[in-house]
A protein has these predicted regions:
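Residues that scaffold the ATP/ADP-binding catalytic core of kinase and kinase-like folds
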Residues: 23, 27, 218, 246
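Short, acidic, Ser/Thr-enriched surface-loop or helix-capping motifs
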Residues: 209-210
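Conserved glycine-rich "GG(E/T)P / GGGxP" loop and the immediately following alpha-helix
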Residues: 6-185, 198
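Short, small/polar residue-rich loop motifs at catalytic or cofactor-binding pockets
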Residues: 200-203
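C-terminal accessory region of radical SAM enzymes
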Residues: 144-190, 220-257
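A detector for short, charged/polar N-terminal pre-domain segments
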Residues: 1-4, 187-195
């Protein structure tokens, strides 16, 4: 199972905290809360995951968020430094709303602690529909905060990217009400009209760990304190092979067929 994990897993999603400050209408958090600011991944599970990844010399991507706002956590920078120390070859990336970025210095801090890539989405306010005028204002405001000079194409495409030190930064204003995912069918308006026939590659190439150490079928599977319909298993911090055994388990094996 260790060798299978090393061979096939290209992305480990590691959600280190619970809280999200937003409740976008194209996300399950809109109806299923993520309000606990203090809830974070248990220390023994965090250490166990890092030790396991270190053991196989993991060098693929680690995504540092699921349904939380990662930058809301006061321990975020410290934990990223610990990941970088223990799994130095991994590419550390995350998505964020940008709400906790106040200046270019905040991006420099992320670069210094070991984040490699960050994707900022300028979200619409709760229960509002996407509109271009609002998004243009948002992207201009954010660019000003981080001292980025926008070109005509940036405004036209509602996106820009640049390097802050070694940190690759991308900012965009996607209309997720049109282009979003139903998150395992929870967002009814985004459910596809036809059911897919072909198997999905996500259970093969991704391994998804929620804030409490439970493992989900896929990064689109929602989980919070009251909703846990897609939990596959829970990491055993006393077993250094736990993530590998879960990856090779019957539940995930069946999901790949």
């Amino acid at each position: 199972s260790e060798q299978l994990f090393k061979k096939y897993v290209e992305l480990v999603c590691l959600e280190m905290s619970y809280y999200c400050n937003r409740a976008c209408n194209y996300c399950p958090v809109h109806d299923l809360e993520r309000s606990d600011k203090d809830l974070e991944i248990p220390e023994n599970i965090f250490v166990s995951v890092l030790n396991s990844l270190n053991k196989i010399d993991y060098k693929e991507r680690i995504s540092l968020n699921l349904f939380n706002e990662p930058l809301a956590s006061k321990n975020f920078h410290k934990n990223v430094s610990r990941i970088k120390q223990k799994v130095p070859k991994a590419i550390l990336s995350l998505s964020s709303s940008g709400d906790y970025i106040k200046s270019l210095d905040d991006l420099k801090k992320l670069d210094n602690c070991g984040v490699d890539e960050i994707l900022f989405t300028m979200h619409t306010p709760k229960d509002k529909t996407w509109n271009r005028e609002y998004c243009e204002k948002q992207i201009k405001r954010f660019a000003k905060k981080i001292q980025f000079s926008l070109g005509e194409n940036n405004i036209k495409n509602l996106s820009f990217s640049f390097l802050a030190g070694k940190l690759h930064v991308t900012v965009y204003c996607t209309d997720w009400n049109k282009l979003g995912n139903s998150r395992g069918g929870l967002i009814k308006k985004l459910r596809p009209e036809k059911n897919r026939i072909n198997p999905c590659e996500k259970p093969i190439r991704e391994f998804v760990i929620s804030y409490d150490g439970t493992v989900q079928l896929c990064c689109h599977s929602y989980h919070n304190k009251t909703y846990s319909d897609h939990v596959i298993s829970k990491i055993d911090p006393k077993n250094s092979n736990s993530i590998f055994k879960i990856y090779a388990s019957k539940a995930l094996t069946l999901a790949r067929k």
